[in-house]
Amino acid sequence: MATPHINAKDGAFAETVLMPGDPLRAQLIAETFLEGAELVTNVRNVFGYTGTYKGKRLSVMAHGMGIPSASIYTTELIKDYGVKNIIRIGSCGAVTPDIKLRELFVAMGASTDSKVNRMRFNDHDYAAIADYTLLRTVVDTAAEQGKKVTVGNVFSADLFYGVQPNMLDVLSKLQVNVIEMELAGIYSVAAQYGARAVGILTVSDIIPTGEATSAEERQTSFRDMMEVALDAAIKL
C-alpha cells in the first residue's frame, strides 16, 4: 500500500534497491541498465523503478539529500515494501588528496554530526556500519571487474556549507576518509528494521585542493560505480 512518500503498489519493489540521491540519476540507471524498467513511484518527483538486470529483479529509487530524507525513504521501503538490501550509490568529497577524483569508495563505517542516531540509541553513540556480506560482495565484484576501490570510513554531515574550522584535520587524524550526507542514517535505519545496507561512492571533490567534477558529470556519468553496484546486487 502507498505510504506518505511512496505511491507504489504492494510488491512493486525488488528485495534489493539501489539508491542514488538524485532522482535523475535513478532515472538514468533504470533507462540505461534495467530491462523492462517500470516507474513505480513518483511522489515529489522522487522516482523509483523496478526492472531486471541480467535476469535478476532489481529496483532503483532516489533518496534525496541528507539524513532526514534518506531515512524517510529507506524506512518506508523496508517497513512497508519488504526491501531487504539497500545499496546507496552516490558522490563524496575526499578529506585528503591521496584519494583521487572519480575513485570508488566503499563505506565501512559512518560517523556523523547529526543527532538522529543518538535519538534512536537512548542518547548514546551508535556505531553505524555497513552489513559485512554486502560490503564484501561489493568489494569482490569490483575486483572481478578490475576496478580499484578504497574501503574506509565516511563522515555524514548535516551541513553542506559551513564545515567547522579544523574539521578536515580531525577527520584525517581519526582515519575518516570522505564526507557525504546520508550513510550514517541509512545504516542505522537498516539495522533498526532488520535489513542490510552498504554504500559505494564516487569521489566527486577533493576538498583540500578544490578539484571537482561538474554537476552534469555527477548526474550522468560515474558508470564504474553503477556497474559495480548492479553486478553486486544480482549476487544477493
From Swiss-Prot:
Example GO molecular function: purine-nucleoside phosphorylase activity
Site keyed Important for catalytic activity: positions: 218
Gene name linked to the record: deoD
Active site: 205
Protein name: Purine nucleoside phosphorylase DeoD-type
Recorded coiled-coil stretches: none
GO biological process: purine nucleoside catabolic process
InterPro entries documented for this protein: DeoD-type (IPR004402), Nucleoside_phosphorylase_d (IPR000845), Nucleoside_phosphorylase_sf (IPR035994)
